[in-house]
Amino acid sequence: IHGNAEALKAVLRKEPDYDFLVFLGDSVLSGPQPKETAEILLDVKPDINIMGNHDEILLDHLLIDEWPEDWRAYNQWAFKQIPSEIIEITKTYSFSDKYEIGGVKFFLHHGQLDRSIPAAIPYADTSSFEALDPGNDCELVLFGHNHIQFTHELGSKTYINPGSVGQPRCGRTHACYAVFEDGKYIPRQVTYDQRPWISALDKIDDLRQYPKFTSWLKEGFLAGYGIGKREPWIRFHEEGYF
């Protein structure tokens, strides 16, 4: 979600009736609507929460000590906006585990791997996917982190990334998510108004001394390239990924 309340609201409007809600991590950081996003999450209360790397930062601010100054300022501002309740709930998030939902067994993982292992994205080696769930026998593995909506078949297993609600990277401006209906996986996307996100970013006084950084954030967000228009995201855009 990455602190994008507008995208989250759009998903919930499109899917008002659900039996079970799974969140795969990265809730309120790094985005300009951390408080609003936190309040929505406190209201909807996902049934399962998986710990993302940005959720870890929320619990341990020292993890950003070596980040660039502008990114540190962005996150330090966000830390001050977040309700204590969401911090306490974040402490209960799981890193990864097996779950049975509606009679279907899943292995859930945020998707962050050791830096020595290439990211689990389309065309990645088998080893990247196997690193997500070593020793696990679940045939369905759900993960996030890489902000691209895709599935990967490996033997009897299906690896599923439902994409990013709040920070797409493949040159599209949709909020991405997925549903399971009657045991069938359905990837979905929904458009939303980007202006409130931009307005929220413009109101962050702590970033006024970093105009190039805020311009870069806006350009990437409006173009659907959350971390910049570059490979492999340009290729993924051309191939139709969300």
Please give the residue ranges for each predicted region:
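Anionic-ligand binding region
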Residues: 126-160, 165, 175
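Short active-site segment of divalent metal-dependent hydrolases/proteases
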Residues: 3, 29, 113, 148, ...
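Acidic, His/Gly-rich catalytic cores of divalent-metal-dependent hydrolytic chemistry
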Residues: 153-242
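Core catalytic region of metal-dependent phosphoesterases/phosphodiesterases
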Residues: 3-87, 91
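Beta-strand-turn-beta hairpins that frame and shape the catalytic cleft
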Residues: 98-107, 154-158
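Active-site-proximal segments of metal-dependent phosphoesterases and phosphodiesterases across multiple
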Residues: 66-73, 104-135, 168
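Active-site neighborhood of phospho(di)ester-bond hydrolases with catalytic His/Asp-centered motifs
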Residues: 21-26, 48-53, 109, 140-147, ...
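Conserved hydrophobic/aromatic beta-strand scaffold that supports enzyme active sites
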Residues: 96-98, 108, 151, 177-179
